[in-house]
Every structure is written in C-alpha cells, then in structure tokens.
Amino acid sequence: SPPVCGNELLEEGEECDCGSPANCQDRCCNAATCKLTPGSQCSYGECCDQCKFKKARTVCRIARGDWNDDYCTGKSSDCPWNH
C-alpha cells in the first residue's frame, strides 16, 4: 500500500512523519508533506539534535561489557554499531 503522511510511521518516500498537522509537535518536520523543514537535516534519532546531525565522534551509545562506545558519524541521525 502507498505511504500515508500523518500516520506517525516513517514510510518510503517520507523524510519524517510527526502525525497530523494539528497534532505535530516537531519543528523539524512539515506535517502536511512529511518532508523536513527548510534547513533541517533530521527530525529524530540518537544523532539528531535540534534538527541537525550531531557532530562526528559524539558518543551516542555507551560501551557495555566488551563493546566499545558507539559514535555519531556527523552524516546521519542514526547511531551505528561500532563494535
């Protein structure tokens, strides 16, 4: 089925989906189009802060056991597994 903008599920073709325009509280996301607002790089994620990607080498997941800390790349809002 085609993506539905406004259902709070990020689907193919959408950059963000914060719900209906009446309920959206995300200034990084245009609720009517499910696209990022002008100047925004992201709207969510461990490596997203105030609509921008966090700087590279920012810790996004603390080490546990034998694993190393995980770091933002500066190019994505996702926190990659670096172990």
Swiss-Prot record:
Question: SUPFAM superfamilies, from UniProt?
Answer: Blood coagulation inhibitor (disintegrin)
* Location of the Disintegrin domain: 2-83
The answer to keyword Disulfide bond applying to this record is yes
Q: Where is this motif: Cell attachment site?
A: 64-66
Is Transit peptide included in the keywords of this UniProt record?
no
Q: Detail the disulphide connectivity of this chain as listed in its UniProt entry.
A: 5-24, 16-34, 18-29, 28-51, 42-48, 47-72, 60-79
Identify the keywords attached in UniProt to this record, alphabetized. Answer: Cell adhesion impairing toxin, Disulfide bond, Hemostasis impairing toxin, Platelet aggregation inhibiting toxin, Secreted, Toxin
InterPro entries listed in its UniProt record: Disintegrin_CS (IPR018358), Disintegrin_dom (IPR001762), Disintegrin_dom_sf (IPR036436)
Its main subcellular localisation, reduced to a broad class, is secreted
Name the tissues where it is expressed. Expressed by the venom gland.
Subcellular locations according to the entry: Secreted
Q: Which PANTHER family does the entry link to?
A: ADAM A DISINTEGRIN AND METALLOPROTEASE DOMAIN, DISINTEGRIN AND METALLOPROTEINASE DOMAIN-CONTAINING PROTEIN 28
User: What is the role of this chain?
Assistant: Inhibits fibrinogen interaction with platelets. Acts by binding to alpha-IIb/beta-3 (ITGA2B/ITGB3) on the platelet surface and inhibits aggregation induced by ADP, thrombin, platelet-activating factor and collagen.
Further remark: The disintegrin belongs to the long disintegrin subfamily.
Q: Record's family?
A: Belongs to the venom metalloproteinase (M12B) family. P-II subfamily. P-IIa sub-subfamily.
In Swiss-Prot or TrEMBL terms, this protein is called: Disintegrin isoform D-3
- Provenance organism: Bitis arietans
